[in-house]
């Protein structure tokens, strides 16, 4: 039977084309449409599985003709390549088993299909493939195992419940489409977060800018703490998030609510780069936000600006512009205000270079800095508008919480009618307290807000029991489906020496297909900040001779972040290496298994030429490869279509036995031809430790 198109085979099988396509997909046979071709081997298999009575009789007739042949090898007949008459007559469909995601473990899968796990492992080992007890299976491998034992499987979700699409996705798509057209965008003020080590002057800097730059308040006005404020510099505005540090920054990132456009990293000139400086830098770098360094406390007698710059280079790889790099570094005194104006000008310069823009009108998207219950206003949210114009009377939604804007209060405590991009305001009018660090959207009507709210609540209820971040094994499984394979780590150790040794060893696990990105490393116990960063970056946390503090453990458990701790270096490296090696595509090698010689050629109608082979050495496998040599020259290289010993289909024949072999798509065989048999084996690849080549 030649190859056929899907619809042609469906016609022969008297099946609906769509039904056949579904069956093919379940069998793991890739087809694109009803016009796709199916190869000859698959056609024959499907005819045997689903064949009509007419085809069955044809196969039986072929079998009987095959049995009548007088030519023998060692006095025995060959049989039909697909097995016994009984098999042809029964022609039963394969057993069908439904599996769920929970069944994709070798032990559970084996139980499901009724085959002992040890037998599966042994059979695959004989084919040159290694399976381990209880190992995770992807759907492709599960189908391969099922096919080996004539079992059909179909995949179904364990929970047969309606999938509810998050309505906020559609709202986000609106903004995505708007951003694709530059004509829809307009320059907006940059939003700045100030980060740095404790006591390096973050709060002092923010207070100085606020006190000297915020516009004069009207008599009787009060300062309203809404988590951010705006200043004006040379006719342009800058919005500062009023809570210094990277905690809020990272929490917002973890919720997909990135508000920061520029980070000012404060480093004290008398103290240099400290652990929290490195931590803050890693948070900013992970978010791909531009960094300006403010070297503070230059008024101190022991201030050393040049030494601090050198530490920026050595510890953070931040090279100042004046040293040939691209990092803007401004020496300042936040206490005395020295060079703070220059810092503000540099912020505007970076903003101009970054082309920070937003949608100036229409529906609103705003980032929540914090939410709280106000004694006078009830549930309120302090936000920075990212896009659109927020107005009194707008219907709003933040996650599952809805509301209607009753009042807007700016950073000067004044009520305003509207707020545009990058403007910080307090929203009054939520029905209940919205989540901090979420996103607020405006919608057309109260009904729309209520509809979204109800759907989000339903989604959250369903996700609550399934909510978890990726474990190491799941990250690797995801990477298997991705072209770019990157494993992100947060690394903590007991000493700087241990940290350097571990970082060096991990970075030497090299592969073109998989990279390890240590997004943050530090000395000391695993903290809430580490968990927040891992949450925002889908990373796992590795600790060496350190523990996670109680708050970090609670947060990790709530967020589903995996923390793995070790006390022996090689155990950490060994486990990481083993996990990564499991992700490498195995190497395929050809291994010669034996040699044989054709003693007799049998011509069989509708089947072709069968080689009567005397095995000389080694063995031959049914699913193996073969090369045919005639007078020392290669005349054929391909696959073995069928292998028989006496009248039985067999998987393997060893020397010095005789056997019958049918070659795939090749009948021009002659007595005296020499055969070389081989198999393709998949060999697990190893990651190797390499010497750094000029890297630091």
UniProtKB/Swiss-Prot annotation:
Residues 296-299 are annotated as: G4. CDD domains: IF2_eIF5B, IF2_mtIF2_II, mtIF2_IVc. Residues 242-245 are annotated as: G3. It is found in: Cytoplasm. GTP binds at residues 196-203, 242-246, 296-299. GO terms for cellular component: cytosol. InterPro entries: EF-G-like_DII (IPR053905), IF2_II (IPR044145), IF2_N (IPR006847), P-loop_NTPase (IPR027417), Small_GTP-bd (IPR005225), T_Tr_GTP-bd_dom (IPR000795), TF_IF2_bacterial-like (IPR000178), TIF_IF2 (IPR015760). Residues 333-335 are annotated as: G5. Residues 187-361 form the tr-type G domain. Keywords: Cytoplasm, GTP-binding, Initiation factor, Nucleotide-binding, Protein biosynthesis. Residues 196-203 are annotated as: G1. GO terms for molecular function: GTP binding; GTPase activity; translation initiation factor activity. Residues 221-225 are annotated as: G2. HAMAP family: IF_2_B (MF_00100_B). Belongs to the TRAFAC class translation factor GTPase superfamily. Classic translation factor GTPase family. IF-2 subfamily. NCBIfam families: IF-2 (TIGR00487), small_GTP (TIGR00231). One of the essential components for the initiation of protein synthesis. Protects formylmethionyl-tRNA from spontaneous hydrolysis and promotes its binding to the 30S ribosomal subunits. Also involved in the hydrolysis of GTP during the formation of the 70S ribosomal complex. PANTHER family: TR-TYPE G DOMAIN-CONTAINING PROTEIN, TRANSLATION INITIATION FACTOR IF-2-RELATED. This is Translation initiation factor IF-2. It comes from Thermosipho africanus (strain TCF52B). The gene is infB.
């Amino acid at each position: 039977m030649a190859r056929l198109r899907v619809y042609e085979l469906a016609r022969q099988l008297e099946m609906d084309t769509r039904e056949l396509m579904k069956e093919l997909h379940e069998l793991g046979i890739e087809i694109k449409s009803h016009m796709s071709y199916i190869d000859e081997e698959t056609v024959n298999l499907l005819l045997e599985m689903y064949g009509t009575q007419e085809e069955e009789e044809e196969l039986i007739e072929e079998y009987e003709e095959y049995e009548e042949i007088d030519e023998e090898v060692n006095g025995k007949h060959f049989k039909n390549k697909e097995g016994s008459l009984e098999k042809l007559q029964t022609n039963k469909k394969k057993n069908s088993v439904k599996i769920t995601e929970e069944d994709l473990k070798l032990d559970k899968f084996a139980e499901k299909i009724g085959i002992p796990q040890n037998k599966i492992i042994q059979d695959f080992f004989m084919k040159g493939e290694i399976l381990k007890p209880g190992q995770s299976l992807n759907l492709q491998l599960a189908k391969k195992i099922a096919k080996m034992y004539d079992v059909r499987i179909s995949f179904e979700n364990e929970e047969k419940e309606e999938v509810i699409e998050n309505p906020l996705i559609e709202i986000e798509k609106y903004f995505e489409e708007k951003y694709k057209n530059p004509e829809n965008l307009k320059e907006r003020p940059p939003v700045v977060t100030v980060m740095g080590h404790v006591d390096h002057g973050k709060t002092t800097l923010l207070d100085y800018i606020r006190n000297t730059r915020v516009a004069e308040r009207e008599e009787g006005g009060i300062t309203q703490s809404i988590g951010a404020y705006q200043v004006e510099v040379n006719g342009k505005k800058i919005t500062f998030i009023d809570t210094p540090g990277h905690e809020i920054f990272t929490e917002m990132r973890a919720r997909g609510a990135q508000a920061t456009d520029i980070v000012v990293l404060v480093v004290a000139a008398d103290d240099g780069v400290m652990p929290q400086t490195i931590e803050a830098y890693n948070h900013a770098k992970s978010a791909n936000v531009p960094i300006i360094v403010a070297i503070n406390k230059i008024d101190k007698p022991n201030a050393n600006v040049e030494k601090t710059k050198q530490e920026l280079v050595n510890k953070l790889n931040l090279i100042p512009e004046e040293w040939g790099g691209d990092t803007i570094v401004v020496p300042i005194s936040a206490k005395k205000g020295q060079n703070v104006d220059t810092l503000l000008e540099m912020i505007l310069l970076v903003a101009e270079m970054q082309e920070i823009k937003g949608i100036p009108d229409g529906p609103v998207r705003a980032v929540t800095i914090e939410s709280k219950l106000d004694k006078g206003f009830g549930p309120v949210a302090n936000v920075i508008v990212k896009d659109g114009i927020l107005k009194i009377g707008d219907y709003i939604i933040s996650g599952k919480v809805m509301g209607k804007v009753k009042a807007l209060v700016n950073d000067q405590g004044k009520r305003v009618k509207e707020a545009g991009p990058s403007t910080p305001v307090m929203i009054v009018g939520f029905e209940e307290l919205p989540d901090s660090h979420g996103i607020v959207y405006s919608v057309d009507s109260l009904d729309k807000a209520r509809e979204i709210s109800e759907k989000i609540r339903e989604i959250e209820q369903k996700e609550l029991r399934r909510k978890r971040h990726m474990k190491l094994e799941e990250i690797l499984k995801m990477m298997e489906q991705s072209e770019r394979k990157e494993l992100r780590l947060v690394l903590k150790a007991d000493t700087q020496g241990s940290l350097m040794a571990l970082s060096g060893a991990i970075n030497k696990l090299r592969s073109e297909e998989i990279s390890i990105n240590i997004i943050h490393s530090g000395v000391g116990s695993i903290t809430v900040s580490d968990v927040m960063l891992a949450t925002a970056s889908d990373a796992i946390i590795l600790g060496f001779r350190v523990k996670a503090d109680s708050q970090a453990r609670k947060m990790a458990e709530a967020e589903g972040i995996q923390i793995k701790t070790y006390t022996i270096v090689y155990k950490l490296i060994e486990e990481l290496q083993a996990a990564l090696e499991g992700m490498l595509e195995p190497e395929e090698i050809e291994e010669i298994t034996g040699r044989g010689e054709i003693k007799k050629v049998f011509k069989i109608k509708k089947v072709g030429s069968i080689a009567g082979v005397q095995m000389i050495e080694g063995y031959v496998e049914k699913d193996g490869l073969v090369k045919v040599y005639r007078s020392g020259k290669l005349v054929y290289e391909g696959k073995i279509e069928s292998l028989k010993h006496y009248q039985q289909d067999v998987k393997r024949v060893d020397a010095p036995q005789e056997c019958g072999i049918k070659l795939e798509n090749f009948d021009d065989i002659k007595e005296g031809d020499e055969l070389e048999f081989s198999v393709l084996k998949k060999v697990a690849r190893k990651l190797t430790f390499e010497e750094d080549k000029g890297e630091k």
